[in-house]
Amino acid sequence: MNLNEITAKVKELSSKSSGKIESKIKFVFNDGCIFIDNTVNPTIINNENQEADCTITISNDDFGKILNKEMDSMGAFMSGKMKISGEMTVAMKLSSLFD
């Protein structure tokens, strides 16, 4: 998946779980990033590199696998395919975004 495809899918999933995370999250990929500000309504989702409470670094391919339910996010983290910095509790809430 490329960044535009991932961004579109995250926007779709976020509309279903708006308000549950209540944090600022940044996903860093091979070809850019996605910033999600879920502290405001409506949720802001863009490709700007902004400060976040939690930053998750993962490849486009591995994130695509998580979105398509081909890979578990916990498994990706435990195997080192996904790195998390910042507030770990925010990262733990992200499962609500992918359910």
Regions found by a protein language model. Give the residues of each.
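Feature captures hydrophobic
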Residues: M1-D99
